[in-house]
Amino acid sequence: MAQQTPLYEQHTLCGARMVDFHGWMMPLHYGSQIDEHHAVRGDAGMFDVSHMTIVDFHGSRIREFLRYLLANDVAKLTTPGKALYTGMLTASAGVIDDLIVYFLSEDYFRLVVNSATREKDLAWISEQAEPYGLEITVRDDLSLIAVQGPQAKAKAATLFTDAQRQAVEGMKPFFGVQAGDLFIATTGYTGEAGYEIVMPNEQAADFWRGLLDAGVKPCGLGARDTLRLEAGMNLYGQEMDEGVSPLAANMGWTIAWEPADRNFIGREALEMQREKGTEQLVGLVMTEKGVLRGGLPVRFTDSDGNQKEGIITSGTFSPTLGYSIALARVPAGIGDTAVVQIRNREMPVKVTKPGFVRNGKAIV
């Protein structure tokens, strides 16, 4: 039977259509996915993301361990609260998961990992951590609410204490701070400003209702997907998995190659892939009628006249732009145009960088 987050009852009270999402009953939408999408782009929306897994690490060798476990380098994290995005790789450089790691103190780091990969992530982390003598705690006692949009911070702040408002004042993106019972982070999955707020499970329902009273719109998985796709953000299982290199998933920027003597899991395989070349993740825009969908073939002719084919990993109609967009994994050599096979027709598409909307504005 699917699990329920501490906010399940609040979702039903808000009229949510609930679906099974990787073993969790989660809201798909609360009536209109499009309205929820526009609320985040134009005002403020909130998402229950309590199905995500929060893992706390304590011990004297955490930094050393995470420098080995992760492709990005936590040596960059020198200011308490600073976070970074990274892949966790297999020895053959496939992506086990993408995650966020927070540096809270020299003997305390926090990871937030995906729900779909929870069991394999925890098993992999435990296995790799064994020699390091760490205390690893899965925080199932905590809930997580993302508040996103141009008015999100202001509306969320109406629920904060004076001390909490002071703690987050001027906080830059990709930081987190423990302020009273709340862990407040300037992270998100929408391409908008906002907070991801962690709280004890027993406080989640009251906090949700407080956000409702502040005029924040509840949003489901449907809007979360169209928002992240407009922002060009990966979804595990679509843009990457254990069979896909981070270099083929627009995650090259998350790999810390320097210092050259840092040994991290997957490094040797990654270096070989970098030398040989990999596929790449691109954006696609189709202004003609129709919708780009995951699994559709993408065809193009490279500069040497060779016919090549890739595949759409995620596609949708963009509510912000008013036409269809997609992410696609394609062989090297693609130019600025291609065609996508939709049923019996080859539809022309424009090839872009992955990412279509930021802070409510088109960037394609």
Curated annotation (Swiss-Prot):
HAMAP family in the record: GcvT
The name this protein goes by in its record: Aminomethyltransferase
Gene field: gcvT
Enzyme class: transferase
EC number(s) on file: 2.1.2.10
NCBIfam families: gcvT, PRK00389.1
Catalytic activity: N(6)-[(R)-S(8)-aminomethyldihydrolipoyl]-L-lysyl-[protein] + (6S)-5,6,7,8-tetrahydrofolate = N(6)-[(R)-dihydrolipoyl]-L-lysyl-[protein] + (6R)-5,10-methylene-5,6,7,8-tetrahydrofolate + NH4(+)
General function of this protein: The glycine cleavage system catalyzes the degradation of glycine.
A GO biological process held by the record: glycine decarboxylation via glycine cleavage system
Entry similarity comment: Belongs to the GcvT family.
Pfam families to which the protein is assigned, alphabetical: GCV_T, GCV_T_C
Quaternary structure annotation from Swiss-Prot or TrEMBL: The glycine cleavage system is composed of four proteins: P, T, L and H.
Record-level GO cellular component terms: cytosol; glycine cleavage complex
GO MF, any single term: aminomethyltransferase activity
InterPro entries assigned: GCS_T, GCS_T_bac, GCST_C, GCV_T_N, GcvT/YgfZ/DmdA, GcvT/YgfZ_C, TrmE/GcvT_dom1
